[in-house]
Amino acid sequence: MKKDFKLNVNFPWGKYFKENKIIYKILLILVVFMVLLFNSTHIIAELQWFQEVGYTRTYLTRALAVAGLTLPIFLIFFTISILYYKSIAKKYDLVAYPKKTPKEIKTRNRFVYIAAGIFFLIVSYGLARDNWYIILQYFNSVDFMEVDPIFMKDISFYVFRLPFYQLLISMSLSVVVLLIVLTVFIYLGIAAKSSINRLNFRNLQGILHVIKSGFIQFAGKALAMLIALYMLLLALKYYMDAYLLMFNESGVVYGPGFTDVRVHMPFLRAMAVLAALSSLVVAYGILKRKVKFIAYPVVLIFALGLVRVFVGLGVEALVVNPNQLERERMYIANNITMTRQAFGIDNVDIRIFEANQDISPQEIRANQHVVDSIKVNSYRHTLDFIKQAQVIRGYYDFNDVDVDRYMIHGEKKQVFLSAREIDHKAITPATWQNIHLFYTHGYGVIMSDPSTVTSQGQPDFLMKDIPVTNTTDIPLDNPRIYFGEMVSDYVIVGTETEEFDHPKGGENETYRYTGDAGISLGFFNKLLYAIEEKEPKILISSLINEDSKIIRRRNVVARVKAIAPFLSYDEDPYLVIANGQVYWMIDAYTITNRYPNARTFGGINYIANSVKVTVDAYNGDV
């Protein structure tokens, strides 16, 4: 017979939880332990990796920046909240729970302190982790020595300092709003537990009575302080919003136009002044329980905001649009000048070359080296042919073709280059041992001459095959590729099993890694990376010994991004052969979308190719 489930409201829940308190404490300790374990293993693994690549200082700078920012943010948030809670909790207890014992109040306060501490620690860490670079930029900013055409401020103000001010204002507003909401909820709790106020919201008089006799009486001073602070922060926000018009995209130009400069900027400054003055008026109204002093400033700011919108629309329609080119001429010129300046094309030397179709045989003979280097092959078609002719085994692949120039037999020639990498997705069977211990690296480089073809009309290979057949005088002593564009998984070298090196006829040549890359796998590190990689085989496999090393972050772009995340990288590294080794070269850029008055392309409006990065394909050195 089916029975309906009913909750036993008479069950002694309090006694049950009290008797089983030790179980919940153990569960809480286990949860905290697991969280700390996984976070600490990640931190240690990251630190070891940065030590391996020689960039410990970079990691520590970031880690110390996050930790150094988390602490003050936490202390500010936590201290303000707890002090405010203490000031308001006394009234709450007197009215809502007059019979509560000091012990009960102490227990509740302890819970509030712990909960608030955990909450604000998580929030503070999140803010520090997501904004550490903004804060470091602010404290390490350098002037551009160039100014914007409207406010005449150095460009560094917009790139480095304005984001920091916005962050401070945003965080402060969030805390103040949180405290105001907390005050309202505490008051509603009191109103529900006592006769201080019956919450009559049926008419305007009832609402005014609730505000004047209940809410303000309960939290008048605290609320006055919070509202005043909120209005001051709002004033700062309006003041900073005027600078944000330098990034306005709604007009005919990127940045401020006629209406922005003549209407929106003055209105925003007026609203900032009004909000600052209103902070005092609203605070006075709360303390004196005069609702009109609270309402009028708020209504006035809102009304001024509406007037700004309608005046802006009117000026745009009646003043600008009928004579747009004349009105916007200066601002269009500003936009063009700042865009050229931002992208470094303001001093371009323009030269006109007249094309001459009448080329004589004498001119051809005089420029034979130019004619000989004319490309007859496309890199796309060359890649297709390489994949057909040079993959050799199904577990190899070529990601792309790069173009470079080399001195070959005393002559500078343009060449196509492509690296033969291991494709882990194509390995069969895809066992853990095959992917991480056996198939550890690619092998060889294909070099072709784009200006010639074979007698069959195919690309002319200068380097090809396994082992590498090299018809150039460019030495390639080590063709092994442990770091590349296609790889992403970790590998473990120096194990009890030999690594696959390359096929040789019907057999496989094996190899043991002799480079410097990798982190030694003693017992502690085996346990550490078993947790970090979520792979218990790292700990229990009998193939891993004390001489084994784990090599991580083998994708060259991911590798350099981890070292310097504040740069933007070209996603297409190009291959270089030098000193008998294979290297990857990556262009790195400093970018921003905060260059004032400059048009954006692809989400940015400033770029500089400030850094060239090389990665050793064998050792992973950066």
Which residues make up each language-model segment?
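Soluble extracytoplasmic regions of secretory-pathway and membrane proteins
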Residues: 3-20, 26-29, 33-622
